[in-house]
Amino acid sequence: MLLSEEPATLIHHTIENFNIAPDKTAVARVTESLATLQQARDLRVREAESSLKKLSRQLATHTSRHDDLVTSHSSADHASNIARLDTLKFRTAKAAADAETDAERLALTAADLKARLRELELQGVEGDAAANARRRDPVDDEVLLRLKVYRSLGIDIERDERDGEWSKAVIRNDRKGDVHVVNMDKKFSRFFYANYFWQTL
């Protein structure tokens, strides 16, 4: 009976008996899933390529900046800048030392002028030494004598304008080339300052 049927009919009945519809549906689902996965993969590849291009551009930019910095800051320029700064530092230090020396010299000049002014005030405007000696107070003579002795030793002392006490002494040592300015405090005795002055001289 099978041999009497048409081949096409036989094939059709065979296919129906196999019931391949669920398999076709499964294959369709698998094909759809593969297509979805391929789309997701293509999207991730495009995103990775975009990130790679962005990083490549950033790398090129940073490389260019690095090359420019290396070119503009060569070792020779760095050494030249260091030498220039050292020279400027030396000149600044020398100028500061010169200014300090000038300030000390001017302070000595001012102290000397004050001492001379004090001496002239004690002598009087007329300049008559004998008459002035008769008119002057013995205390003024003692002060004048002390000032002369101190000045002969290289010491200029100044009074405080408020209470008239000796407040500052400028000691010059021409042999050593030293200058010391001493602010005299009442809590130290005259013996202490006398010893200090002699040690400084």
Curated annotation (Swiss-Prot):
User: Gene Ontology terms, cellular component aspect?
Assistant: cytoplasm; Ndc80 complex; nucleus; spindle pole body
InterPro entries recorded: Ndc80_Spc24, Spc24_Fungi_globular_sf
Coiled-coil segments on the chain, per record: 39-124
**Keyword annotations for this protein?**
Cell cycle, Cell division, Centromere, Chromosome, Coiled coil, Cytoplasm, Cytoskeleton, Kinetochore, Mitosis, Nucleus
Quote the subcellular location field of this record. Nucleus; Chromosome, Centromere, Kinetochore; Cytoplasm, Cytoskeleton, Microtubule organizing center, Spindle pole body
Query: Where is the secretion signal located?
Result: none
Q: Which GO terms describe its molecular function?
A: microtubule binding
Please name one Pfam family that this protein belongs to. Spc24
* Gene3D superfamilies, sorted: 3.30.160.430
Give the GO terms filed under biological process for this record.
Answer: cell division; sister chromatid biorientation
Under PANTHER family, the record lists: KINETOCHORE PROTEIN SPC24, PTHR22142
Assembly and interaction partners: Component of the NDC80 complex, which consists of NDC80, NUF2, SPC24 and SPC25.
What family is it from? Belongs to the SPC24 family.
Explain the purpose of this protein.
Acts as a component of the essential kinetochore-associated NDC80 complex, which is required for chromosome segregation and spindle checkpoint activity.
Protein name per UniProt: Probable kinetochore protein SPC24
- Mind giving the lineage of the organism this protein is from? Eukaryota, Fungi, Dikarya, Ascomycota, Pezizomycotina
